[in-house]
């Protein structure tokens, strides 16, 4: 069986500042909460995402940039994230929170391709999603950037969530 994030050092991964604790970080999700959230969202969350959220449920990483081959409205060669949504409902920036995945689809018009997992510094004008279009609701989704300012242009960032986390770089 594959070990999630084998060899990856999370020692200095998270920036547990006041804002992160207030808006993003929740207690580790129970299996029951995970099942409830998956049912509400209509998608099976990737094992690597669940594993990471059981270690640290949401938050702001120190490394917030992911390189891209094509320019975005944010930069010529990368996207930036503000934080990673945790599994839950109680924090505004959690999967089923006040500003969670369904809110971004319903209120901001993001395409229904999967689950919003990261917000970006643009305050809603671009987001990071788990993209289930190719794999279906129970498969292993890709991680994509969706740019609202460019007619919801979708750019693939990583083949899976673990590769996305491993690819984050310092600004």
What are these regions (language model features)?
Residues 119-121, 134, 147-150:
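Short, flexible loop/turn elements at secondary-structure junctions
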Residues 154-165, 169:
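Compact, glycine/acidic-enriched structural inserts
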């Amino acid at each position: 069986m594959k070990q999630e994030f084998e060899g990856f050092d999370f020692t200095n991964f998270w920036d547990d500042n006041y804002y992160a604790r207030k808006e993003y970080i929740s207690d580790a999700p129970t299996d029951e909460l995970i099942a409830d959230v998956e049912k509400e969202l209509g998608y099976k969350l990737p094992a690597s995402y669940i594993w990471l959220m059981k270690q640290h449920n949401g938050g702001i990483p120190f490394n917030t940039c992911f390189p891209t081959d094509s320019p975005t409205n944010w930069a010529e060669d990368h996207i930036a994230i503000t934080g990673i949504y945790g599994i839950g409902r109680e924090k505004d920036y959690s999967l089923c929170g006040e500003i969670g995945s369904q809110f971004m689809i319903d209120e901001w018009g993001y395409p229904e391709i999967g689950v919003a997992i990261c917000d970006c510094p643009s305050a809603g004008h671009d987001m990071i999603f788990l993209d289930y279009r190719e794999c279906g609701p129970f498969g292993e989704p890709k991680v994509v950037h969706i740019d609202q300012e460019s007619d919801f242009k979708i750019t693939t960032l990583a083949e899976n969530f673990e590769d996305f986390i491993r690819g984050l770089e310092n600004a």
